[in-house]
């Protein structure tokens, strides 16, 4: 793992670079390859991108191994930032005493009235804040995040309203945002209004290595459980596309 303080992270290209939040999952990997396309990939192989991942003692830490491999496919720099797990209490993804919900009947019924226990308190707020500070300090002009509001409507930090509010905060709370030059750091969410089927199709169209991705919240010996919300949504997406999941 490379230090964030490495001066080589500074974006020196005419078209300023981007930080991409990369979990190692299907959505963030597709988002990464869309960012790469925005910067001229595959014709341009020297991409001004920095992949940023977080180790917060999540149960599915295998996603970090996947994120390393995915970043290497583009030859871009990759940082894994360690966070104290005490930041993220009250979630089934971080606390062993809380079981990840399985086979949730409300997932597709429209009866979801409560926030799932897989929600991690303030996670995207913290992740985006780290990325924003890193972007401003190192000269990147945008941040890509692969949230989508349709599949994860139960998560408050995946909604369009949240992204809009964070963009306003970035405009008001950074030097770039208040400089009056009109070049504030932009939060880009290319998957925000897409379902899993559309994300899979989009990922395939830009050459994203979906076979390297990991989505399961509660893996068993590194293998998907097949029953958590994320596994079910992923399986449904590939079924609708009519393809076998390349990660299985």
From Swiss-Prot:
Keyword vocabulary terms for this entry: ATP-binding, Ligase, Metal-binding, Nucleotide-binding, Queuosine biosynthesis, Zinc
Cofactor binding comment, as recorded: Binds 1 zinc ion per subunit.
Record-linked InterPro entries: QueC, Rossmann-like_a/b/a_fold
Enzyme superclass (EC): ligase
Gene3D superfamilies per record: HUPs (3.40.50.620)
Functional pathway: Purine metabolism; 7-cyano-7-deazaguanine biosynthesis
Residues annotated as binding Zn(2+): 216, 225, 228, 231
Needed co-factor(s): Zn(2+)
Residues where ATP binds: 22-32
Catalytic activity: 7-carboxy-7-deazaguanine + NH4(+) + ATP = 7-cyano-7-deazaguanine + ADP + phosphate + H2O + H(+)
GO terms for biological process, alphabetical: queuosine biosynthetic process
GO molecular function, one term: ATP binding
Pfam family, one: QueC
EC number: 6.3.4.20
Role description: Catalyzes the ATP-dependent conversion of 7-carboxy-7-deazaguanine (CDG) to 7-cyano-7-deazaguanine (preQ(0)).
Family, per entry: Belongs to the QueC family.
Protein name per the record: 7-cyano-7-deazaguanine synthase
The organism of origin for this protein: Leptospira biflexa serovar Patoc (strain Patoc 1 / ATCC 23582 / Paris)
Gene symbol of the encoding locus: queC
């Amino acid at each position: 793992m490379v230090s964030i303080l490495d001066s080589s992270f500074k974006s020196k290209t005419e078209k300023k670079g981007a930080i991409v939040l990369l979990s190692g999952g299907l959505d963030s990997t597709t988002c990464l390859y869309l960012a790469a396309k925005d910067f001229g990939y595959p014709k341009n192989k020297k991409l001004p991108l920095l992949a940023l991942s977080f180790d917060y003692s999540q149960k599915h830490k295998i996603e970090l191994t996947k994120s390393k491999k995915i970043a290497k496919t583009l030859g871009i720099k990759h940082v894994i930032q360690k966070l104290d797990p005490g930041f993220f209490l009250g979630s089934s993804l971080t606390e062993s005493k809380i079981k990840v919900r399985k086979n949730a009947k409300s997932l597709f019924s429209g009866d979801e009235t409560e926030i799932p226990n897989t929600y991690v308190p303030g996670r995207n707020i913290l992740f985006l804040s780290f990325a924003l500070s890193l972007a401003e300090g190192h000269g990147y002009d945008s941040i890509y995040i692969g949230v989508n509001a349709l599949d994860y409507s139960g998560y408050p930090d995946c909604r369009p309203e949240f992204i809009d509010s964070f963009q306003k905060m970035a405009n008001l709370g950074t030097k770039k945002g208040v400089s009056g030059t009109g070049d504030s750091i932009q939060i880009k969410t290319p998957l925000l209004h897409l379902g899993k089927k559309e994300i899979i199709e989009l990922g395939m169209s830009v050459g994203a290595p979906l076979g390297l991705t990991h989505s399961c919240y509660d893996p068993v010996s590194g293998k998907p459980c097949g029953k958590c919300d994320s596994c079910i949504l992923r399986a449904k997406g590939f079924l609708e596309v009519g393809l076998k999941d390349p990660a299985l």
